[in-house]
Regions:
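PLP-dependent amino-acid enzyme catalytic core
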Residues: 1-352, 360, 366-392, 403, ...
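Short, polar/acidic, helix-capping and beta-turn segments at strand->helix junctions
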Residues: 395
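Mid-chain, well-packed structural core segment of small domains
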Residues: 400, 407-408
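Active-site-adjacent pocket-lining segments in enzyme domains
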Residues: 414
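Short, Lys/Arg-rich amphipathic alpha-helical interaction segments
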Residues: 442-445
Length: 447
């Protein structure tokens, strides 16, 4: 197939049936929409081009810089598209958590600006959040930049109402699937596809998948974060369920090894979430058939992007998959029972403890967030580096008082549970994190 421009290769991705011998569903045909085969490697290629294209001529004329609040696939696609048209691109984020994507953005000539922030995406109601302030500044003055605004731009959703959704219907012979499954990041793809499918059949079931609380799966928000996304509408989904990072990796490995799909952990989360949700429905359908062949139903999930960019993510969480010894003292092994037993300290209690016993206060946030505001006397060890230290054993004396601090108290509680299991006798987590400390009017200092 011949193209005159690489952007012509965006879209029209294959819809591939997953072998039932792999997923085990007896009455439901499960299909993967291979968005990973877009030319820049992900489902975000569609939205990036649809958001950029209408304003491209004006941006070129005034030599504007393309700017997006993204640390992942949207930034990657926009960096390529901007470069194609002689424009500069700047990625603004609170934290680059996938080093391979950071390096690729730099290779593509992108400028990366990291700001302190409490979430992977901005909260327009939080006027103190630097990402929110930056977003507002971009919105108010567009003379020298083109802000594609993926979290609020309706063209994000439109890319899927005009492309992805109709392609699924066409490839299924003109009918919508019985179920559609998508991970929720900006909510653009899930909203756009669901809208089209329900126009064909209002009875289509839509499953939205989010990351489990305090977990990190690239490209997926937690339930708390997703409410901050302007395109997110809970009415789009019949049900929203959580997927863990371990489940995402397990699903990814199954797609890689059993299905020949070199998809990443986001795709693994969509696959594993789809199978888990559909299994009881499949069993009920088989039971009702009473031994007769059941009428086939269909389900589609989005295979978002490729695996190659996430080998570091796998190495940190499941090193045994890459031929390395499993990490001792891994954060992912903390149980709910251990978490429930953690000694939390509210703001008032923590202030008294600091005054009376002078515990070591360890701030687990990124360096930019720490520099912006932190508890006086706290040291900064970014959570990923802290976990690497813990892999080798207790980083402090067993009896030394330690107060762990993170944005909202979730990650610090998991670390406190892990250190307690390892034998530390006096570690606590700041309940509610820095946000609770700030909201209580407790003092914070700047670097």
């Amino acid at each position: 197939m011949r193209y005159d421009d690489i952007t012509e290769a965006i879209g029209n991705t294959p819809l591939v049936r997953i072998d039932p011998a792999v997923h085990g569903l007896r009455t439901i045909d499960l299909y993967a929409k291979l968005e990973m085969l877009n030319p820049f490697g992900s489902v975000k290629d569609r939205a990036a081009w649809n958001m950029l294209r209408p304003d491209l001529a004006g941006a070129v004329e005034r030599d504007a810089q393309v700017v997006e609040l993204s640390s992942g696939n949207t930034a990657k696609a926009l960096a390529v598209l901007a470069g194609l048209h002689g424009l500069r691109f700047r990625s603004v984020t609170n934290r680059m958590r996938v080093p391979e994507l950071r390096e690729l953005l730099l290779l593509l000539g992108a400028e990366i600006e990291e700001l302190p922030g409490r979430s992977e995406c901005l909260d327009p109601t939080d006027t103190d959040d630097p990402l929110t302030q930056f977003h507002r500044a971009l919105t108010e003055d567009g003379a020298h930049h083109l802000h594609t605004d993926q979290y609020f731009n309706p063209r994000n959703t439109e890319a899927h109402t005009t492309g992805t959704g109709p392609e699924i219907v066409k490839d299924l012979g003109g009918r919508a699937p019985d179920w559609f499954v998508a991970c929720v990041g900006t909510a653009g793809s899930s909203t756009g596809v669901a809208r089209v499918l329900r126009e064909h059949d209002p009875g289509v079931g839509v499953l939205g998948l989010v990351a489990a609380k305090s977990d990190f799966i690239p490209g997926i928000r937690t339930l708390d974060e997703v409410a901050e996304v302007g395109l997110f509408d809970p009415e789009t989904y019949d049900v929203i369920e959580a997927v863990t990072a371990d489940e995402a990796i397990d699903g990814m490995v199954e797609l890689n090894r059993r299905c020949g799909l070199l998809a990443g952990p986001t795709s693994g989360a969509a696959y594993r979430g789809a199978v888990s949700h559909l299994r009881p429905l499949d069993e009920e359908r088989a039971r009702r058939a009473s031994g007769e062949p059941a009428e086939r139903a269909t389900a589609v999930f989005i295979a978002c992007d490729r695996v190659e960019s996430y080998l570091g993510y796998v190495r940190r969480r499941r090193p045994e998959l890459l031929g390395r010894a499993p990490h001792r003292n891994a954060l992912a092994t903390v149980t709910e029972a251990e978490l429930a037993a953690v000694r939390d300290a509210g703001v008032a209690e923590a202030r008294r403890w600091i005054e009376e016993e002078r515990p070591l206060v360890v701030d687990l946030r990124g360096s930019h967030a720490y520099a912006a505001l932190h508890i006086e006397g706290a040291i900064n060890i970014v959570d990923e580096l802290f976990e690497q230290q813990v892999h080798g054993g207790l980083p402090f004396g067993r009896d030394r008082p330690v107060l762990l601090v993170c944005p909202v108290g979730e990650k610090s509680a998991r670390f406190a549970a892990l250190l307690t299991r390892m034998g530390h006798t006096n570690v606590r987590s700041l309940a509610g994190g820095v946000v609770a400390w700030r909201d209580a009017g407790a003092p914070l200092v700047r670097e």
